[in-house]
Amino acid sequence: MLTLTERLPQAAPADATLTLPFEVRQKSRFRATLDDGREVGVMLSRGEILRDGQCLQAGDGTVVRVHAAAEAVSTVRGDDGLALARACYHLGNRHVPLQIGAGFARYLHDHVLDDMLRGLGLEVVSEQAPFEPEPGAYGGGHGHTHSHDHSHQHDPAGHAHEH
């Protein structure tokens, strides 16, 4: 079985492709099937999400390009920047991984979040599309991972949700 162990710093000519959903692209060690049907093991250093177009290399020099799989997402589109900013605020306040693009915001499909945003007057479309969220909130960014089994204080002005 081919084992991919190195992230290449830039795109390179690929010998094969590997299409993965976001859930798997967050992991550093997993088994998968290349798009040509061959089995592959991935053993990378922790801390980075695999991005669409990123290339990985095996010890024998084989290069594999990663593709983001189309998956169930919810997309908020609009020309009203304030409405989109409001949507991003509410989703970010819930620590939802979020893809932000020109005129849209996208998250992994969640009917509860869809209903919340529709309640704010936004149009939400459920669709199949690649999901490439902003990198800051996970994979080396600021996570909110401290334990909540202890007493602590947050400045209410500096922290937007209750514990």
UniProtKB/Swiss-Prot annotation:
Residues covered by region (Disordered): 130-163
Gene3D superfamilies attached to this UniProt entry: Urease metallochaperone UreE, N-terminal domain, UreE, C-terminal domain
SUPFAM superfamilies on file: Urease metallochaperone UreE, C-terminal domain, Urease metallochaperone UreE, N-terminal domain
UniProt keyword terms in alphabetical order: Chaperone, Cytoplasm, Nickel, Nickel insertion
Pfam families given in the database record: UreE_C, UreE_N
Compartment(s): Cytoplasm
GO terms for cellular component: cytoplasm
Domain of life: Bacteria
Keyword hit for Electron transport: no
GO molecular function: nickel cation binding; unfolded protein binding
SMART domains named among the record's database cross-references: UreE_N (SM00988)
Extent of Basic and acidic residues compositional bias: 146-163
One of the protein's GO biological processes: protein-containing complex assembly
Biological function: Involved in urease metallocenter assembly. Binds nickel. Probably functions as a nickel donor during metallocenter assembly.
HAMAP family (alphabetical): UreE
Similarity field: Belongs to the UreE family.
Protein name per UniProt: Urease accessory protein UreE
Organism of provenance: Alkalilimnicola ehrlichii (strain ATCC BAA-1101 / DSM 17681 / MLHE-1)
